[in-house]
């Protein structure tokens, strides 16, 4: 520890936050912000015009694990709820007490002295954060064990003869013809876009209808850069595409057992898009060959984030598997019954059985304590007559290290990593989207690619930034048109002016986009203490160094000691460091990744885009003048 008198820089003490007394209202506020539960790749929103909107919406916090944060909300106070700081709320009483409304109102009013006393008691005992966190986490862990026990009890009941597999014999009888099946399969796949990405649209910029009515170079560029636009090919992933395609073709030609393929990479690196592009090419080739050439297969896609419970995968998979037969209608059966039907299908030897390629996106969301679901997924392809390929996609690079040994043994060693896009790849992607549109100058594309590649290498992020820049340029052009029209309508003016010509989108437009994103975040960061900002900076540095979204608590502590020693300031002790984590969790800057008591191996994840936080910390007055960029 460095003495404060000898420190070249001194900073205020670490902030402490009191426990939240607003149980009901904080829950409602969290639910309002949970509009995009299925999306992990939330991007920053521009400045909102609604002054009453929450700070979480202004900085574009994602709530993919909102349920886990809600479990801790009783222990940590959301320090950003400034509008309700002077109000205290309590849980509603029973409906029978409605007649005593006047008495209830009196009970809801507390003395200011009582509130301040509660706050002082909380701030004096910093270890309460540790105890409160552990108690809530242990409670959530017991709930998960109860759910697993209930699932096992239902399985035992079904094994007592309440379910008859014979009534579903038609599920295992596949048509040898397969023409109708192929048509249904192709029609279904035509509806699936290669680049189907669930995201929050950054283009929430109050565009006028006139922007889209005027068919100019800016609107065309925005359409070409939209995430839903389907390019004819995906540049920058040629090597990964060849590896995946070779694996699928080899298994299809064998036409017996299948295999497992694990694809890992940060969000926005083209994992799902690459697989879908390969499937589309194989289906087109199958159509040309009339279903021959060993390419007759059914493609099934399941997103783990769309399942309310991991065991729901069995029911969804069963219904999608039987859709190839028109005579079979989806049947309402339990997940346990669906599991038995699926297992029997993969075990039976049937030459007419169709090969299946199952893509499981957001695979890491299916992990439970016993890991039964993912064990079954990796076990099925290993059966001799399964005719099944499982392609598991996850955002976690070190997922195999978190799996149980029995699951690892079934998973195999087939892994395809997707590293973040570099500058050249991002430039190629943007230019390929624009094709012959001369909307951006060369410098603007280079700056956008460099800024994104330096932080996350997310192609979706780069495309959205360019779209936003096109919107800004279009708004400027519309203003020039308005002035031009008003001038021509003014008869007092002599002569006529030339019609404005759309100019190129420049680097200034790109920089303006980054400033719009960082403005609300900077306000949020200003409310944090110096050490809380350092804590976030440590997470950012580890994310950029390891390309893994989760960071171990012990790693953050080590990096904190290195940084504080370099800039000659005191390093927080373990208790203070844990309090920093609790404060940032209460402010929803970070997410606790699993339901276990915190320790040195505990995983912590940012709750907002890495590139936005990195840019905001670079602009922060407390950090930008310190030599910590290379730590």
Swiss-Prot record:
GO terms for biological process: DNA replication initiation; mitotic DNA replication checkpoint signaling. Residues 1-164 are annotated as: Disordered. CDD domains: AAA (cd00009). The keyword Oxidoreductase does not apply. Residues 91-104, 141-160 have a biased composition (Acidic residues). Residues 55-80, 105-133 have a biased composition (Basic and acidic residues). Disulfide bonds: none annotated. One of its GO terms (cellular component) is nuclear origin of replication recognition complex. The keyword Transmembrane does not apply. ATP binds at residues 230, 265-273, 362, 395, 460. It comes from the Eukaryota. Mg(2+) binds at residues 361-362. Pfam families: AAA, AAA_lid_10. GO terms for molecular function: ATP binding; ATP hydrolysis activity; DNA replication origin binding; metal ion binding. Belongs to the ORC1 family. This is Origin recognition complex subunit 1. It comes from Dictyostelium discoideum.
């Amino acid at each position: 520890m460095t003495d404060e008198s000898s420190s070249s820089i001194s900073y205020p003490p670490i902030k402490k936050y009191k426990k939240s007394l607003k149980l009901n209202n904080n829950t409602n506020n969290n639910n309002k912000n949970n509009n995009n539960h299925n999306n992990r790749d939330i991007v920053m929103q521009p400045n909102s015009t609604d002054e009453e909107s929450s700070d979480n919406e202004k900085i574009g916090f994602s709530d993919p694990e909102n349920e886990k944060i809600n479990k801790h909300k009783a222990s940590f106070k959301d320090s950003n709820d400034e509008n309700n700081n002077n109000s205290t709320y309590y849980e509603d009483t029973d409906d029978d007490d409605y007649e005593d409304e006047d008495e209830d109102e009196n009970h809801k009013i507390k003395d200011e002295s009582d509130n301040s006393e509660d706050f002082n008691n909380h701030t004096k005992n910093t270890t309460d954060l540790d105890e409160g966190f552990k108690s809530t986490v242990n409670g959530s862990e017991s709930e998960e064990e109860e759910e697993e026990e209930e699932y096992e009890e239902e399985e035992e009941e079904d094994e007592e003869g309440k379910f008859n597999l014979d009534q579903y014999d038609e599920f295992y009888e596949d048509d040898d013809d397969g023409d109708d099946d192929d048509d249904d399969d192709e029609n279904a796949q035509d509806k699936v876009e290669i680049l189907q990405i669930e995201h929050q649209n950054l283009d929430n910029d109050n565009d006028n209808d006139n922007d889209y009515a005027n068919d100019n170079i800016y609107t065309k560029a925005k359409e070409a850069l939209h995430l839903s636009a389907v390019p004819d090919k995906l540049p920058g992933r040629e090597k990964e595409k060849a590896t995946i395609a070779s694996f699928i073709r080899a298994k299809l030609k064998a036409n017996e057992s299948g295999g497992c393929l694990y694809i890992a990479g940060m969000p926005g690196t083209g994992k799902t898009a690459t697989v879908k592009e390969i499937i589309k090419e194989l289906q087109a080739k199958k159509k040309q060959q009339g279903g021959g050439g060993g390419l007759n297969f059914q493609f099934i896609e399941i997103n783990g984030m769309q399942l309310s419970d991991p065991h729901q995968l069995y029911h969804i998979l069963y219904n999608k598997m039987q859709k190839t037969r028109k005579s079979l209608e989806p049947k309402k059966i339990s997940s346990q019954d669906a599991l038995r039907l699926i297992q029997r299908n993969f075990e039976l030897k049937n030459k007419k059985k169709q090969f299946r390629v199952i893509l499981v996106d957001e695979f890491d969301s299916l992990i439970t304590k016993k890991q039964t679901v993912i064990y079954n997924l990796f076990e099925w392809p290993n059966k001799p007559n399964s005719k099944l390929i499982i392609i598991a996609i996850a955002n976690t690079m070190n997922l195999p290290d978190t799996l149980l040994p029995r699951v690892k043994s079934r998973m195999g060693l087939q892994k395809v990593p997707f590293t973040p896009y570099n500058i050249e790849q991002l430039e190629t992607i943007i230019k390929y989207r624009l094709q012959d549109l001369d909307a951006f100058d060369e410098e603007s594309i280079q700056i956008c690619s460099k800024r994104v590649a330096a932080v996350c290498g997310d192609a979706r992020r780069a495309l959205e930034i360019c779209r936003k820049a096109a919107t800004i340029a279009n708004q400027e052009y519309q203003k020039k048109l308005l002035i031009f029209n008003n001038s021509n309508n003014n008869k007092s003016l002599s002569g006529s002016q030339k019609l404005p010509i759309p100019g190129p989108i420049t680097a200034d437009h790109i920089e303006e986009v980054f400033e719009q994103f960082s403005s609300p975040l900077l306000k949020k960061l200003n409310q944090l203490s110096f050490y809380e900002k350092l804590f976030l900076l440590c997470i950012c540095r580890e994310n950029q160094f390891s390309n893994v979204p989760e960071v171990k608590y012990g790693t953050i502590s080590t990096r904190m000691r290195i940084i504080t020693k370099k800039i000659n300031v005191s390093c927080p002790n373990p208790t203070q460091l844990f309090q920093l984590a609790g404060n940032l969790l209460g402010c929803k800057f970070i997410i606790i990744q699993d339901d276990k008591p915190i320790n040195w191996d505990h995983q912590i994840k940012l709750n907002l885009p890495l590139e936005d936080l990195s840019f905001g910390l670079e602009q922060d007055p407390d950090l930008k003048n310190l030599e910590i960029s290379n730590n």
